[in-house]
Amino acid sequence: MLTYKFLLIKLTATVLIIFPTLSFSVTVNDELRFATQMLSSGSMISLESAENSALMATVGEPKASLGHWLRAQSLYGLAGVGYDFDKKDRPFLEEARVRMIPLPNNLLPGNIFTFQTANSNSQYVLLMETSAFRLFVYKIDEFGNLSYENSFYSSIGLSGDNKTKEGDKKTPIGVYRFIKEISNPRADGFLGDIAMTLDYPNAQDKRDGRTGYGIWIHGVPKNTYVRSPKASDGCLALSNKDIELLKQYITYKKTHIVIVSKVSWLDPYTWKNNSKLIQNLFTSTSQVAGNNKNKVVAYYRVSKDRPSVALIRRGEIFYRDYWDETNKGLKKLLSERLN
């Protein structure tokens, strides 16, 4: 049984790396994050702030169960009433822990590098950090620079990430394209009104023997705001409102999502230098150099134990090329044509 005091310690200790939060207009997600942070402080003033933010969250979204739960805990604390938690509180504790993870400020992901090129395929790229249950959207400008656009809370597979086989209830790690949109993906409405399909398994997944299919980004039942952090069969599950917002960033068969366990955050100066280094590596790599029809559009690093992925335009056709980074440069493993 967890006590109220232990909850405060547990939530605070979970956040090991602290970033300043980004500045943007206050949303339900922001209110939930702030309420959780204030509740973890434990002072009377903080509890009052937590109660107020939790109330605002539930006014903005009555289906936000975490908001109701946080408000109840705040009121218990203000009244000096002790409370013991049991298993029915666990989903709220898990979501509250996730809400405590701050967003990065003025940093760029070292997992994604984009380059200046005409017809670069998409204006946006998505990045899912499964350990933070956070889906980031980045805009790509005409010079190949990345800038933060938006982010969303997202549930992942019930058994975590790093999918290897069909039915393991894990979210895959890798680089994937959005393929198409499905309306009313399940008759009972459990997946919301919209699902966006991904092209899992990709060529590298197949080569490595990873199986399964039907990895989507979808919504939640109408009587729900969000699901618990680990709740799906392997898909990414967003709130129905967030799914509608996400749609504006997606161009089917063009927009990519990079799914990683942990993002490698870089300051903009380091990101730019790494981007130039990668461009130079491709220029000096025999498989690419000497063919002016090849244009490197983007370069994605998934993890140290996975090949990196280059999005290449050859004429009017796009390819995903899979590369090993070695001490002698880049070694091409596989090329996948994107229809």
Q: Where would I find each of the regions flagged by the language model?
A:
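Alpha-helical segment of the N-proximal tetratricopeptide repeat
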Residues: 29-56, 60
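Short beta-strand edge/turn micro-motifs at domain boundaries
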Residues: 309-339
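Exported/periplasmic cell-wall-interacting domains
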Residues: 37, 74, 180-280
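Alpha-helical linker/edge segments of TPR/alpha-solenoid repeat scaffolds
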Residues: 75-109
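Gly/Pro-biased beta-strand-loop elements
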Residues: 103-215, 221-225, 331
